[in-house]
Structures are given as C-alpha cells and as structure tokens.
Amino acid sequence: SNSKMLSSEIASTLGGRFMRVDIYPYSFPEYLAAQGKDKNYLEVLSTKDRAEVVGMCDQYVKYGAFPELVDIRNKREYLNSIYQTIYLGDIMTRNKITNDFAVRLILKKIAESVAKPLSFNRLSNVLKSAGAVLGKQTVINYVGYMMDSYLLFTLQNYAAKLVEKETSPKY
C-alpha cells in the first residue's frame, strides 16, 4: 500500500533524491511469458495449445495481471486484500471520507462503464438517484483520490477537440 506516502509526498519529503518507478500489470504476452510460454507461442498453436491459451486468457481477464499473482494460489483473496488496503487505507482513511456508500457507488458505476465516456455530472446524478447526494466537485475529488492511489486510471480520449477530451474521461 502507498497509504503512508503517495508519490507526490515522497517527492517533497525526499527533495528530489529518488527515482519513481511505476510497475504496471502484465500485458497478455508478458502474462504468457510469466506462465512459461515462449514469445513465439501464439504463432504456432495446436488445438490443445489454443484451449490452454483460452484458459489463460480467461484467468487474465478474471483476475488481472499483477506480476505476483502468477504464483499465488488464492487469487481472489489476494486481490480482495489489495482492494481493501487501497480502499480503506489510501482512499477513505487518508482523505477522511465518511460517505462509504457514495464512494462504493462511484466505483461500481465506473466499473460498469469501463472504456465508455462518463462525466462527473452523470456520476453525481447517479449518486443522487441512489440517495447519496454529492456535488460535482466532491465527485471529482473522490475520483482524484482513487487515481492518486492507483485504483483507477484514465484512458486517453483521442477526440480532436480539447473540450471533448476533458469533459468525458474514460476509466
């Protein structure tokens, strides 16, 4: 967890005497390599190999591709512990958020809208209709906290106009 210090706090504390290295989940080819499959593995596949790759793809989609997950038997429990640490430590406690219901709704709505444009106004309206009234700025702040703790990432919107890029971010 990064609940002790987020990267912006590390920079100010260490005064520039550090190098930030972000470690992201595996791409699917990297995931296959971590499973012991040669990089040319996908080029020459028998029927048995195809079935194995489909099974690996299912696991990749279901559990994600954190490098340490390759060797962990109970993946769901491990992922849940990461989520709880980030959610409770890095988001709720660090930012003194007491509206747990609203934060969970924001996460659920973003999760069900993956790769689709989603405005902060829309999120605020969804919360209001569910009984959790939050202003647009509070929603923006909460999503920012989620991004600071690496729970969410934005997907680059390749719209030609700046306004289109910035008004409907994708996560």
What is each PLM-predicted segment?
Residues S1-I10, M146:
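Sensor-1/coupling segment of RecA-like P-loop NTPase cores
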Residues S1-N2, K39, S46-K48, G131-A132, ...:
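A short linear-motif detector with a strong N-terminal bias
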Residues S1-S3, G16, K165-Y171:
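Proteins with a high burden of low-complexity, intrinsically disordered sequence enriched in S/T/G/P/A and R
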Residues N2, S27, Y158:
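A generic "binding-loop/recognition-motif" signal
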Residues S7-P117:
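Interdomain motor-coupling "hinge/lid" segment immediately C-terminal to the ATP-binding subdomain
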Residues D71-Y171:
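Accessory nucleic acid-recognition modules appended to NTPase machines
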